[in-house]
């Protein structure tokens, strides 16, 4: 009465961090098709404002992507960029910058295989350096 199960090995470096959880990236496909999508995309918040924009190649994020802060009632951050950086084969790579909703720089540094590498610089909401850290 045993249960046979197969174990699948997953390279954690290829997982995408969203919040405090990691997910396996999925291929982005044409609606109603099994063909992976290649081309530019723009995603929108329910308000109609841009949420993210960037290119896909063979179903994976590939190229410079920009993310915007979600608009708020007071409209202090409408249209303000939240982060911008490079994807290669669906994984963050190279230099990335993040901003506070007020438009000041929050942090910047490099990624390799979805992991922070090298020197990262962190800023307060006034744009002043508060910490540097090596990864």
Give short role names for the model-derived ranges.
Residues 2-135:
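Glycine/tyrosine- and acidic-biased, solvent-exposed loop/turn segments at the edges of beta-strands
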